[in-house]
Amino acid sequence: MNVTEETVYSGDVKTVQALSSADDNIRYDSKAVFASATIYFEFDKSTLTSKSIQTLKSAVNALNENSSIQITLAGHADERGTREYNLALGQRRAETVSDYFVLNGISKNRITVKSFGEERPAVIGQDEMSYAKNRRVEIN
């Protein structure tokens, strides 16, 4: 099977759109399919920033275009704080993003929420730039 894809970026939201297929027996919906996004947080916070809200608006639009998509929200924290505290903080961050989606019309049934705390850093380092990249929710 040969599928041509176009990757489209809207803010920090990545969508993939199937454009054509060499296999005539398979039909592809031309609607954009949500792929991923990352929402960043301030130190020890689980509130959304204005930049995060813009990213989430784009994600809501992509999810509304294809109502069959299920998403996973994975909450993360930097390494400061105890393991237990960071797991709880990652959970609060993921729940905040979930609440935003639900308030904007995305069914809770389409959303899975989990936390990894500090266990899966995006960046290794002990400086503010590294910490900032690790304070996040990944939407997949």
Segments the model singles out, each with a brief description of its role:
Residues 1-70:
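Periplasmic peptidoglycan-binding/tethering modules of Gram-negative envelope proteins
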